[in-house]
Amino acid sequence: MAKYVIGSAWPYVQTVPHLGNMIGSVLSADVYARYLRLKGHEVVFVSGSDVHGTPVEVEAIQLGVDPAEYSMKMHAIVAELFKKWNISFDLYTHTHSETHIKFVQDFYLKIYENGYIFTKEDEVPYCPRDKIYLPDRFIIGKCPYCGYERARGDQCENCGRLLDPKQLIEPKCAVCGSKPEWRITKHWYLDLRRLEDRIRKYVEENPHLPPNAKEMSLAMLKEGLRPRAVTRDNKWGIPAPFPGAEGKTIYVWFEAVLGYISAVVEYFKKIGREEEWKRFWLDPETKVVFFVGKDNVPFHVIILPALLLANGGGYVMPTTTASTEYLLYEGDKFSKSRRWGVWIDEALQLLPADYWRFVLIYIRPENRDTNFSWSTALEIINKVLNDDVGNYANRVLSFIKNRMGGAVPPRGKPSRDDEEFIEKVKRLFEKAEAHYEAIELKDAVHTVVEIAREGNKYLNARAPWDLVKKDVDAANAVMYHAYWSLKFLAVGLAPAIPESAEQLWKMMGLDAPLTWEEAKRPPAVGKALGEVRPLFRKITEEEVKALLAKLEELRNQKYSRKYPWEQVVI
């Protein structure tokens, strides 16, 4: 079995993630990590809250609170919400942990010693009113590439391009809105030019990168990589370890991406196996997979590999960065200021976690932007989750419970139809496996659902309710194979809807662990079923209207409160 490090993009903690953030990184990573565990692989799945840098510091200044207090309160809330979403992190940490701070400082000192860091004096924006330098999100303006009006000093969130504050058109202070002045300051730079050829080779020869990640990265490389400042003048962050860099901090993106390593270090430290992190990150056979939205591609496909190469510590290069396109909400971008979208705390007040997980994976934006709409969600829940999956499971188990003594019937002598059905189920299961392996999670789930659809057609064609009256052996064979197909269905859907899959497993009376191989094992004849009940229920249009009214009421309560940690519903 293989070793995997799975990482999902580290969310900023100035607010909780929305549905688009979830499917773009955390939920997708969880589905893949769960699949790998079902296959028996050794998996360490990590992430954490990105608590440093300008996003938190700007918000804290505006609210008049300490950035550390702000970020730790929000981190605890986000961590709890991920648990409620059944995200199976081995460790969810934060970038202010002692382990991360020490790791980052030691890592950058090594890069400095290797000669990849140089100093340069540069003009940087400064707000004379607030008497602060304006790195990254402290300064906003118009993007020179796409014209987006609120591009940040380090990156445009609209087009994803990395920026320098000097490139912004009509820049202003994000705190007070004043026009900045420019002052000379010294910063420490990573010399990306010296790493460019090796990064190009990594990108061009990587067969695992999705098209959007490869195309975006090659476009950046075609323009040529420029040195990037790894230090900032803001106070809230990891102190820069370089000689003479007192008062400087490490740029948040250049330290947060190292969290995928430091979190693995911290995880093994917590379980008393301190040196075992090396068995993952220092082994060239380890597969390292990141899950991010496409706006995070540059830092994962260009910057992090560059840092690993510059450090020279023998770290394994990332296998791939599974980057999604954007999820829209009712045809438009998510926007907290416009109250447009659903955030993960609100979602759980409306529907169970597995409903959300299934819908989001079912429409995952793998190759193009996709749209979440309540009408689409209603159709997926009612027709796919309830009618196809839930109804099939209930038909099979209720019939065995009520007409066959509540235990798995003998296989008997299956007909050609019975054998063809289970072979078709096995082929679908293998096809779903191939999709999971390729991180085509949407296609994987769509394929597993086909098992339920084929099962419903099989029951309708074989009509065991008639067979049982005239040929008990034939009826037994039908229901034996239908029961077996539920094993494939439960295991195939377990990465996406783990709670429901476990419920189905228990209803089937199965004691064996739910694993990929267990699905393939023929059922034990005579195995008593557990309590049989419907897995899902339909949602009416009237209920959706009531849910949206509840959502608006929740928001009126949330946004009447001052502090972000008071605006979260748990």
Swiss-Prot record:
GO terms for cellular component: aminoacyl-tRNA synthetase multienzyme complex; cytosol. It is found in: Cytoplasm. Its EC number is 6.1.1.10. GO terms for biological process: methionyl-tRNA aminoacylation. It catalyses: tRNA(Met) + L-methionine + ATP = L-methionyl-tRNA(Met) + AMP + diphosphate. A motif ('HIGH' region) lies at residues 11-21. Zn(2+) binds at residues 143, 146, 156, 159. ATP binds at residue 336. SUPFAM superfamilies: Anticodon-binding domain of a subclass of class I aminoacyl-tRNA synthetases, Methionyl-tRNA synthetase (MetRS), Zn-domain, Nucleotidylyl transferase. It holds the Pfam family tRNA-synt_1g. Disulfide bonds: none annotated. GO terms for molecular function: ATP binding; metal ion binding; methionine-tRNA ligase activity. Binds 1 zinc ion per subunit. Its cofactor is Zn(2+). Keywords: Aminoacyl-tRNA synthetase, ATP-binding, Cytoplasm, Ligase, Metal-binding, Nucleotide-binding, Protein biosynthesis, Zinc. Gene3D superfamilies: HUPs (3.40.50.620), Isoleucyl-tRNA Synthetase, Domain 1 (1.10.730.10), Methionyl-tRNA synthetase, Zn-domain (2.20.28.20). A motif ('KMSKS' region) lies at residues 333-337. Is required not only for elongation of protein synthesis but also for the initiation of all mRNA translation through initiator tRNA(fMet) aminoacylation. Belongs to the class-I aminoacyl-tRNA synthetase family. MetG type 1 subfamily. This is Methionine--tRNA ligase.
